[in-house]
Regions:
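Membrane-embedded beta-strands that build the outer-membrane beta-barrel scaffold
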Residues: 2-6, 11-19, 55-63, 70-78, ...
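Outer membrane beta-barrel strand-and-loop segments of large Gram-negative receptors
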Residues: 18-65, 96-104, 108-110, 139, ...
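Outer-membrane beta-barrel proteins
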Residues: 22-28, 68-69, 81-87, 188-194, ...
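Extracellular/periplasm-exposed beta-strand and loop segments of Gram-negative cell-envelope proteins
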Residues: 26-32, 41-50, 87, 100, ...
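Active-site-adjacent bridging/hinge elements
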Residues: 27-32, 140-148, 248-258
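Membrane-spanning beta-strands of outer-membrane beta-barrel proteins
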Residues: 50-52, 163, 274, 331
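Conserved small-residue
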Residues: 64-160, 191, 196-248
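Membrane-interface anchoring segments and C-terminal beta-barrel signals
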Residues: 89, 193, 231-342
Length: 342
């Protein structure tokens, strides 16, 4: 690590690098011969090994310019890990093993957009997740065997947990006025969106489709003309065609094999965000006024919490880390107050 102090301690910083190997991690055995007879109830053992490396740091800068005093401070943590051993059976496809990848690595199919027409379907590898139609999601045949199935599931995107976490604080005073802001953020993470709020007509829902799903779905010209709505045959539309069939929801659970509702890059979203976590603005009355009313100190203040968030993901709060969007969001609040010291 490095510790530094510059400009008569106006600027201070600390940076630490870490490289940790952790072995003997207690976990369920993943690979046991069938002759052992424990396929349905595998024992736990100290068989896992993970290597983690990264850095964390913080800094602070203080300065005074005329009557203005201000402080800037920040912190950052970045980490990346790799699974070295987890007692897993050798897979036909090395890319489907957990070893060599990160903990919480997202996995799924690679989406190539939506099928444009039936010629596109006939000229593409056969997809084994139910019959497909134009407007359904088209996937990449990773292993080149002519079919798309679970053998084409690969590591995609980043991890479901942030690898990067940071914060920034700003504070300043000028005579009786004081302002303080605190930003926080996270990056290097992605998550899948799913559930009835995203997948229309699933989980027993027959209506209440989100407007964004309805307006941005794929819809062919013939259907659009019948319904009197604009057509959208864009192979990169935000949502596939609406469906009641087994390719959509059918009469089975959402966890069974269906083409459009598979974990894939089509439903993978960026979990990065920056949030103005708190802002505090206050004014302390001058001593000559306070003394007249026989108080020691009087401060009027306003505090705001979770007022602004910047993120490419707009459907719900990315900090929740929720794929379904059904958790109660963080509340925004503004508080006005008066602090009096006698």
């Amino acid at each position: 690590g490095i510790d530094m102090a510059l400009f008569n301690d106006k600027f201070t910083a600390t940076i630490d690098y870490f490289d940790e190997s952790r072995s003997g991690i207690y976990m369920e055995r993943a690979f046991l011969p069938g002759m052992v007879g424990l396929d349905g109830n595998k024992p736990y053992a100290n068989v896992g090994e993970v290597n983690s490396k990264g850095f964390d740091g913080n800094f602070s800068y203080k300065q005074k310019i005329s009557d203005v005093k201000f402080t800037v401070r920040g912190n950052i943590t970045y980490s990346k890990n790799e699974i070295i051993e987890r007692d897993e059976e050798n897979n036909v496809y090395a890319y489907q093993m957990k070893k060599g990848y990160r903990v919480n690595q997202n996995r799924g199919l690679i989406a190539l957009g939506l099928f444009k027409d039936y010629d596109d379907i006939r000229n593409s590898p056969t997809q084994k997740y139910g019959p497909v139609m134009p407007g359904d999601i088209k996937y990449k045949d990773v292993n080149g065997d002519g079919v798309v199935n679970d053998g084409d599931i690969v590591a995609i995107g980043s991890t479901s947990k942030p690898n990067l976490i940071y914060g920034l604080g700003l504070s300043a005073t000028w005579k009786g006025l004081d302002v303080s802001l605190h930003f926080q953020g996270a990056g290097k993470s992605q998550f899948f969106t799913y559930g009835k709020c995203i997948w229309a007509f699933t989980e027993g829902q027959w209506g209440n489709i989100l407007k964004g799903t309805l307006d941005n779905r794929w819809v062919d010209a013939e259907t659009a003309q019948k319904l009197g709505i604009p057509a959208n045959e864009n192979p990169n539309a935000s949502y596939p065609r609406l469906s009641y069939t087994d390719n959509g929801n059918g009469n089975t659970t959402i966890y069974e094999y269906k083409n459009n509702y598979r974990n894939s890059t089509y439903w993978l979203r960026n979990g990065s965000y920056v949030r103005l976590k708190t802002i505090d603005v206050g004014y302390t009355l001058p001593k000559k006024i306070v003394n007249k009313i026989h108080f020691n100190n009087v401060r009027i203040f306003m505090t705001g919490t979770n007022l602004l968030t910047w993120s490419s993901f707009k459907l719900w709060d990315p900090e929740m880390g929720a794929s379904r969007g059904e958790q109660y969001p963080l509340a925004k609040s503004i508080t006005l107050g008066l602090s009096v010291n006698l």
